[in-house]
Amino acid sequence: MDGAGSLTRSFFRSLRPQADLKAAAIGAVVLLREWVQDKRRERLHAARAAAKDKIKAKAVVEREPPPRVVALVERYLPRRVGISMTVLLLIGSCGFGIVKGGHLQDFVTAISDARNAMANSAGFRITSVVINGRKQLTQDEILAIGGVSGRSSLLFLDADAVRDKLKANPWIADATVLKLYPGQLMIELTERKAFALWQEAGRLSVIADDGAVLEPYVSRRFLSLPLVVGKGADTQARDFLALLARYPQVNSITKAAIFVGERRWNLRLKDGLDIRLPEQDVGNALAMLSRLDKEDKLFSRDIVAVDMRLPDRLVVQLSEDAAKAREEQFKDKKKKKAGDAA
C-alpha cells in the first residue's frame, strides 16, 4: 500500500509543470491577439482621422475668397452692428413691400386701431360728444368729416387734425375742437349759409355768399333760393343780388339773373321776359324799370325783351303775335290814309 501511494504522488508531481506551461502559453496567445486588435484599431482610427483632415483641407483650399467689401465688413464691423443692419434691412424690405403693394393706409389704420383700443381700455373712450352751431349738417356727418369714429380714443385724438378736416368742408367756415378728459369731446362750429343756386355748364350747385360751392343741388329745401347763371356769377352774385333787392318791384318777379360774358347781367322774369341790363350804372337801369312798370305797366305788356344796353334809349321787342298785330295796324292806317287822299 505504501509503495502504490508513493508511486501515485510521484506521477501527479510530474504533471504540474506541464499544466502551468500550457496555461502560460494560452495567456500569451490571448495577450498577443488583443495587442494585434488594438494596433488594428489605432491604424483604422488614424486612417479615418487622416481622411477627415484631407476633406477639410480640400474644402478650405477649394473655397473661393470672399469679395473685398465682404472681407472688410467681416474684419472691421462689430458683430452686433451687423445684426442691427440685418434687422433694419428686413424692416425696410417689409416697409417697401407694404408701400409697393398699396397697403400703407391699411397698415397705419391697424396700428392706430390697436393704439386706440389700448387707450379705450384704460378709460379714455369718447363717451360724450357736444356739437354747437350745427344747422345744415347732422352730428353723424360732422363726426365722419372730422374722422372721429367709435374706435377713436380721446387720448390719441388730434384736435388740430379734426379741426382742419372740418374746415376743409365747404359748409363749415370755422371750427373749434376741445378735448375734456377723460371722455368728452366738444366741437364749436360756424356754418356757412346757403345763399343762392348757381347754374354753370349744366350743373346746379348751392353756393354761399362768398361764392363757395356748398354742395350739388339735390334737395328741394333750397328751391326758394335765388338763381344765378353763367361763368363768374358765383363770385359776383352777392353784390348784384344785394342791389336787386333794393328794387322789390323788379326783384319779386325775377326768376334768374344771368351773368353775360363775365361783364354784365340779364334778368329773366317769371313770365319769360328778358331784361338786358347795361354794363355800367345798373342801379339807374333798375330804377327806370320800376318806374316804367308802375306808370305804364311795362311788365304786363305783350313784349319778350327790354334792351337797356344803350345809354340814351330803351328798346322793346314785341312778341310775335304783338308784332303781327302791330303790322296789321300799320297796314290799316296806310289804307285809311290812301282812301282819305283819294
Swiss-Prot record:
The keyword Cell cycle belongs to this UniProt entry's keyword annotation: yes
Q: Keyword Cell cycle on this protein? A: yes
What membrane topology is annotated for this entry?
Answer: Single-pass type II membrane protein
Residue span, POTRA domain? 124-192
Q: Name one GO cellular component term.
A: cell division site
Compartments, as annotated in UniProt: Cell inner membrane
GO terms in the biological process aspect are:
division septum assembly; FtsZ-dependent cytokinesis
Q: Where are the transmembrane segments?
A: 81-99
Look up the domain of life of the source.
Answer: Bacteria
> Which segments does the topology annotation call Cytoplasmic?
1-80
Query: Which stretches of this protein does UniProt put in the Periplasmic compartment?
Result: 100-342
Q: Identify the keywords attached in UniProt to this record, alphabetized.
A: Cell cycle, Cell division, Cell inner membrane, Cell membrane, Membrane, Transmembrane, Transmembrane helix
A Pfam family that this protein carries is FtsQ_DivIB_C
Stored HAMAP family: FtsQ_subfam
Family statement drawn from the similarity comment of this UniProt entry: Belongs to the FtsQ/DivIB family. FtsQ subfamily.
PANTHER family according to UniProt = CELL DIVISION PROTEIN FTSQ
Q: What task does this protein carry out?
A: Essential cell division protein.
This chain's protein is named Cell division protein FtsQ
Give the species: Bradyrhizobium diazoefficiens (strain JCM 10833 / BCRC 13528 / IAM 13628 / NBRC 14792 / USDA 110)
